[in-house]
Regions:
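C-terminal motif of bacterial Sec signal peptides marking the signal peptidase cleavage site
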Residues: 15-17
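All-alpha RGS (Regulator of G-protein Signaling) helical domain and cognate RGS-like helical scaffolds
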Residues: 20-214
Length: 214
């Protein structure tokens, strides 16, 4: 039997193919704003679980740290190749944070403020921050912050590979949760994160192997 999360990720290709074939005729006859409202209303019919909420909320903070360290690249003497990579990361993950915030807002759920340190939570009445899988530790952040030039490039790639692998782990955890990812938006987003970040991991490993040459 194929594990559930592998079967779900395999289905992402079919979902994407169906989406690319065009919107339903009823939507194409509407104006853009009406079509968006109809699509939003349709999406609200899908069930969602606490695992879905935790995933969407947690990934906001996970993405926030990736954006934070990517924004350091220009001022740390990063190579042109690395700066191009960081620009892609910033653009893609900024858009994805908006998607996650919209999903939560549309369901009248709490929309967290992005926190690069991790997910804020209370334990024994005190505020704590829970890091997500793969997120950089304080020591790693200080090490990267102090690095310059080729050393920054090397550390950034090493740490971002770690960070991306953590995101893939979060997707695997979601898809292994009973009843999770039945919501179309959550499923497609999770599948995109897994596929896109796995692809970027391979690219970054190659950049490390080649010494990060443009």
């Amino acid at each position: 039997m194929i594990p559930r999360h592998f079967a779900l990720l395999a289905g992402a290709a079919l979902l994407t193919a169906c989406a690319s074939s065009g919107a339903p005729a009823s939507l194409t006859r509407m104006g853009p704003e009406a079509a968006r409202e109809r699509a939003r209303a349709d999406s609200l019919r899908y069930p969602y679980t606490k695992a879905d909420i935790d995933f969407m909320s947690g990934m906001i903070h996970h993405h926030a740290q990736a954006i934070q360290i990517a924004e350091w690249a220009p001022s740390r003497g990063a190579s042109p190749a690395l700066i191009r990579l960081t620009e892609r990361i910033i653009n893609a993950q900024t858009d994805e944070i908006r998607l996650m915030q919209t999903w939560l807002r549309d369901r009248n759920l709490e929309v967290p403020t992005p926190n690069p340190a991790g997910m804020p939570m209370k334990m024994n009445g005190m505020d704590h921050v829970m890091p997500m899988p793969g997120m950089l530790t304080d020591a790693q952040l200080r090490q990267l912050d102090a690095a310059r030039g080729p050393e920054f490039d090397r550390l950034f790639l090493t740490f971002m590979i770690q960070h991306h692998r953590g995101a893939v782990t979060m997707v695997d955890t979601l898809l292994a949760s009973n009843g999770a990812a039945l919501d179309e938006t959550v499923f497609k987003f999770a599948a995109d994160v897994s596929v896109d970040q796995t692809t970027e991991i391979k690219r970054m490993l190659q950049m490390l192997l080649e010494g990060n040459t443009p």
